[in-house]
Amino acid sequence: MQTLKNLKKTYSQVFISSPDYDSRAVYARRRQFMLKNLDSFCIFAGMPRDPGSEEAFTETWTRFVQEPSFLYLTGISQAGCYLVLDPKSKSETLFVPRKDPFKEFWVGKRLGYLEKDSDVARLTGIRDVRPVEEFDAVLEKLCKKYAKTGFAYALYFDTLQG
């Protein structure tokens, strides 16, 4: 098991941290502030994919820029991730793509879900980390839980083509 310091070095391209302060605590305070001020659940979607990656052989060297709200609350600068905040249970759930060693060979280290691996949780301070495949099921449960509220907050990058 890597030390937190080594984890920060390993994932420095996808998780913003500083040796001068506890970045996990900064992001946790921001999420706690949001949880205290929400009256329904909220979804923060990071950018859905890396620039130019939607078709084979179109990878570009365009710099990836994360959705600002997601980055502000998590410090994660990686495509395909979601954060769900639930004020009723005061919970925060992070959804990340599954660990993909083949992709990491080509694009560098990435945060990823791996069964019985707590690296993402240790790095971000978010205890409930799940694979993105579980996002829809969690969303469905939250919609039922908040059915009387009549609304939810969603901050996401619109990928629909008109």
Where are these regions (language model features)?
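A composition/biophysics-driven feature that prefers long, compositionally simple stretches
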Residues: 1-162
